[in-house]
């Protein structure tokens, strides 16, 4: 349940909780998640795969300058990709859903709710991709336990917030909970790296 695994687990949990909501809630989450996962699948996974070998090499060579540079440039790239994607999905959620899905049994009301869910999911998109980078920073140091423990905290956060928010926000509350839990995950990953002096922002990133 590390990296993309915890994201998928949170979606599964959200879907289970949504089963107690009115008919259609699960579909709204499903279609919104499909679109939200697209930038993550294209850029996040590729970034993590490319980052790990080069970062591992720099760490084994005790090259702190190169290590910091790789980590900072990776975060820069993740933000450069994810922020425009998140803004685009947030602003254009409704027309995107309308064009792609509104036909047959998927009516205007479904478009409205799915778009709302997507816009809230999008708030967590930068965090999802940053998580890919930060988890790779742990893996490159052969530390798999810390990201695992942090992912457990993220899942618990998601469950608690989802249960608190579904009463007033329906499936949108589940999307908000998922986004917040992703940022909690990313923040904790960064804090543990910083505390251990494994992460230091340079002037370019700041």
Regions found by a protein language model. Give the residues of each.
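Membrane-embedded alpha-helical bundles of multi-pass transporters/translocases
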Residues: 1-206
